[in-house]
Structures are given as C-alpha cells and as structure tokens.
A protein has these predicted regions:
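Non-catalytic, usually N-terminal nucleic-acid engagement modules in DNA/RNA processing proteins
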Residues: 1-81
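Short, low-complexity, polar/charged sequence segments that are solvent-exposed and flexible
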Residues: 21-25, 77-80, 96, 159-162, ...
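A charged helix-plus-loop insertion that forms the helical arch/lid used to bind
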Residues: 64-107
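Extended two-metal-dependent nuclease catalytic cores across DNA- and RNA-processing enzymes
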Residues: 52-53, 89-274
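Flexible, active-site-adjacent loop/turn segments at secondary-structure boundaries
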Residues: 8-9, 14, 82, 92, ...
Length: 275
C-alpha cells in the first residue's frame, strides 16, 4: 500500500513533543535535532504499520508562509487562497473557535517536511480533502482525524496518548456507526450523514438543532442504503426548517463532506441520491 500521511497532525503532535515543563514548572524547548529524529521515526513507524510498498506522500494544508516556501523550493508560482468552507459557513464561522497556540518547532517541522519528503500542499481545501481526492484501491490514508473515515478505502490511525490505533482497516462505501462515550464514531456514508445531523463541535459546525448523537444514532443505525440515510436526514431537516430545509441541509453537508474531486480549482460537492 502507498501511504498518504496527514502531516497537519504531525505538525502539532511532534511539535508539542519538542517542549516540556521541567521540575520547577519552567517551559523548556528541546533541540531541533531531537524533534527531527522523532519526526522521521514517526513517519517510518507509520509506513511500517501499513506495510508500505513505496515511500509516502505527506499532505499539508496551505498557509501563506508554506506557499512561499514551496515556491522557493520548487521554483513554482502557487497562490494561496483560504479554505472554501470559510465562505460556505453562514451560521457559525468555520473553525472560528480554534485558538490553539502553535508549538515552538511548528514552522521548523513544516519547512523540513517540504524540503525532505514528497509533499502536497492543499490550497483552497484542507489536507484531508487532498488525501480523499488521492485515495485509490492501492493507497492508505494515515491520519488521526476522525473526519477522513467517511472516505472509502484503506485507513490507518496511529496511537497517541489515550487514542488507540485504528487499522489498517478497509472502509466500504456505506460504512457503519456506533456509540462511544456519548459520541458517534464510524466510517463511510453512515458517518457522513450522522455528521450532517450532529454537526462537528471541533470544527464549529452546528448541524441540526436538537439532534444530538443518541437521537441521530437511533435514526440512522438501521439504514441499509445511501437512499435510506438521505430520506431520514431530509425528513428531519424538513421538520426543523420547513421550506428552508434544502438550503440548510446543503450547507451542513458541504461543510462536513470530504472532497473527492475538483473542477479546476473548485471542489465538487456531494451529490445526494435524488440529485
């Protein structure tokens, strides 16, 4: 299998391993060489866990700084543009609540990855979307991001802290959902449709009012086709929004959908079963 690695996750995971508090509670920064070795080893561990048959490609969500670095390295002329979801979100700002401080070595890690590994910059979309676009029968998405599990194909999540490893596992198109600690976890279209209902607090996506995880799970668990999933979700949106149901449903679906294809520079949105 050919690993597609979510480097957005590594920027933070490895970055925060590069700092600590000593016995006096003072914030300390580890040497870059320590962080670099940790990063290289993590990438190697991921590749070995999925029995890779060729070197990985690492995916990064573009920032203006990363685009400049890319252009210098590749004598390219890419132009940065923001994530398309920012413009789509009308109820809440997409990821507007995220105020996480970047680790000290964040930029060092990004620059090192671009200079050392085969990387792809996701411009106007997220690294997650770029990985979903490139997923084939011979690739495996390697990420700890739950959203990517809606994508059909091979998946692997490496362990980190209390988060256990997932896979390598083959996800089918319909997928499945289950309840874990009061939340819906799952794969494929079932997980995608559940997100349309519940939203995603991590990304500041509101979902459908008054449809939490338990209620949504009970409605979608027994669905055996894409059409059944859609019919349930459409009915619920009509109950809440009346004549505005289609607009509201489309917005939430476009926000949680992992893009699978592009039309030039524009992402192609999900097509519901009824068109």
């Amino acid at each position: 299998l050919y690993p597609l690695i979510d480097a957005d996750v590594l920027l933070y995971e490895i970055g925060f391993c590069g700092e600590y508090k000593d016995e006096d509670g003072e914030h300390k920064i580890r040497e870059w060489e320590f962080v670099r070795e940790l990063l290289d080893q993590k990438i190697l561990d991921i590749c070995e866990a999925v029995f890779n048959s060729q070197p990985p490609t690492l995916y990064l969500s573009a920032t203006p700084k990363l685009v400049k670095q890319w252009n210098r390295l590749h004598s390219d002329n890419l132009e940065w543009k923001p994530n398309f979801r920012i413009e789509l979100a009308t109820k809440k700002g997409y990821k507007a609540q995220r105020k996480q401080e970047k680790p000290f070595h964040y930029n060092n890690i990004a620059a090192y990855l671009l200079a050392t590994y085969d990387c792809k910059l996701a411009i106007g979309i997220e690294a997650d979307d770029a990985m979903a676009i490139d997923q084939t029968e011979s690739t495996i998405i390697c990420s700890r991001d739950k959203d990517l599990k809606q994508v059909e194909g091979w998946h692997y999540s490496w362990p980190c802290g209390k988060q256990l490893a997932f896979g390598p596992t083959l996800v089918d198109k319909l997928g499945s959902i289950s309840m874990s600690k009061g939340k819906i976890v799952g794969t494929g279209l079932k997980f995608f449709y559940s997100q349309i209902m519940t939203g995603d607090p991590v990304d500041n996506i509101p979902g459908l009012p008054k449809y939490g995880p338990v209620k949504t799970y009970n409605l979608l668990f027994d669905c055996n086709s894409e059409k059944e999933l859609y019919d349930v979700v459409e009915t619920c949106y009509k109950v809440v929004y009346g004549e505005l149901w289609e607009k509201e449903l489309r917005e939430q679906a476009n926000l949680v959908w992992m893009v699978r294809d592009m039309n030039g520079e524009e992402p192609i949105m999900y097509e519901f079963p009824n068109g």
